[in-house]
Curated annotation (Swiss-Prot):
Residues 165-167 are annotated as: CNP motif. One of its GO terms (molecular function) is metal ion binding. Calcium-binding protein that interacts with rotavirus cell receptors once the initial attachment by VP4 has been achieved. Rotavirus attachment and entry into the host cell probably involves multiple sequential contacts between the outer capsid proteins VP4 and VP7, and the cell receptors. Following entry into the host cell, low intracellular or intravesicular Ca(2+) concentration probably causes the calcium-stabilized VP7 trimers to dissociate from the virion. This step is probably necessary for the membrane-disrupting entry step and the release of VP4, which is locked onto the virion by VP7. Disulfide bonds join 82-135, 165-249, 191-244, 196-207. Ca(2+) 1 binds at residues 95, 206, 214, 216. This is Outer capsid glycoprotein VP7. Ca(2+) 2 binds at residues 177, 228-229, 231, 301. Some rotavirus strains are neuraminidase-sensitive and require sialic acid to attach to the cell surface. Some rotavirus strains are integrin-dependent. Some rotavirus strains depend on ganglioside for their entry into the host cell. Hsp70 also seems to be involved in the entry of some strains. Keywords: Calcium, Capsid protein, Disulfide bond, Glycoprotein, Host endoplasmic reticulum, Host-virus interaction, Metal-binding, Outer capsid protein, Signal, T=13 icosahedral capsid protein, Virion. It comes from Rotavirus A (isolate RVA/Cow/Thailand/A44/1988/G10P8[11]).
């Protein structure tokens, strides 16, 4: 009887040892499989971390810095308003207390002291290189200049819309624009853009891909360039990258917390790139006054109506994201 019990005990003991051995073997095998899988994934991610030649990747970057949305029933009492104006306005007014005067006038329209910020920029070209719109509501004043009409139109197109952008490696790859919302946006001290359209055999159409001097020049020494080419056609690009950054961008829609007020000019600038239509936006306005005091008085008078045409947003335009965000 004792022999049977010892035998049963030994069988149980051997079963436990065998089960433990099998379990450890399975564990080691699973560890090996998992580690090998992770190694393969790591190597593959390194290898495919670049765009294949001529293939278009989804545009995922952003020019927006996110902030908490604090929309209230009475936005004028809880929001901030930024007023962007050219240096010539301050020079003409020539009064050290002029912003304080305007702040008191904005107070009569329901905007508390400290909620309105006055932001100065040198000129349209300089503002185009580094546009940063941080307030809940942003009003940009542009003095109309017939020689700068196209620059003003491009700047308005940039700041009145939201864009998603990806970097472009023009030294290795060619690119194509997929639709009307897809544009190439370049910013910098001096941007000269040349393009060479390609056929299905990746040969240049009217140009030589190995000779940038044969490319078509679409922009010369500009600070902001929004380039539009034929959709669905691959292009080789040549850009002055030492003084310019170019991105592949997709227009998402209107940036509704920004309004542009054109000072002077017969008509409001048309910012559309579609030649078949001439759409106007409520947030593109015009004031006809010669003196800047008159301009600012009008802004104060109509500030609440202007803001009503806008919407408070949770994102603010930050051009630093254009340069550094992937």
């Amino acid at each position: 009887m004792y022999g049977i019990e010892y035998t049963t005990f030994l069988i149980y003991l051997i079963s436990i040892i065998l089960f433990n051995y099998i379990l450890k073997s399975i564990t080691r095998m699973m560890d090996y499989i998992i580690y090998k899988f992770l190694l393969i994934v790591t190597i593959a991610s390194i290898v495919v971390n670049a765009q294949n030649y001529g293939i278009n990747l989804p545009i995922t970057g952003s020019m927006d810095a996110s902030y908490v949305n604090a929309t209230k029933d009475k936005p004028f009492l809880t929001s901030t308003l930024c007023l962007y104006y050219p240096t010539e306005a301050r020079t003409e007014i020539n009064d050290n207390e002029w912003t304080s005067t305007l702040s008191q006038l904005f107070l009569t329209k329901g905007w508390p002291t400290g909620s309105v910020y006055f932001k100065e920029y040198d000129d349209i070209a300089t503002f185009s290189v580094d546009p940063q719109l941080y307030c809940d509501y942003n009003i940009v004043l542009m003095r109309y200049n017939s020689s700068l009409e196209l620059d003003m139109s491009e700047l308005a197109n940039l700041i009145l819309n939201e864009w998603l952008c990806n970097p472009m490696d023009i030294t290795l790859y060619y690119y194509q624009q997929t639709d009307e919302a897809n544009k190439w946006i370049a910013m910098g001290q001096s941007c000269t853009i040349k393009v060479c359209p390609l056929n299905t055999q990746t040969l240049g159409i009217g140009c030589q891909t190995t000779n940038a001097r044969t490319f078509e020049e679409v922009a010369t020494a500009e600070k902001l360039v929004i380039t539009d080419v034929v959709d669905g056609v691959n292009h080789k690009l040549d850009v002055t990258t030492a003084t310019c950054t170019i991105r592949n961008c997709k227009k998402l829609g209107p940036r509704e917390n920004v309004a542009v007020i054109q000072v002077g000019g017969a008509d409001i600038l048309n910012i559309t790139s579609d030649p078949t239509t001439a759409p106007q936006t409520e947030r593109m306005m015009r004031i006809n006054w010669k003196k800047w005091w008159q301009v600012f008085y009008t802004i104060v008078d109509y500030v609440n109506q202007i803001v009503q045409a806008m919407s408070k947003m949770s994102g603010s335009l930050n051009s630093a994201a254009f340069y550094y965000r992937v």
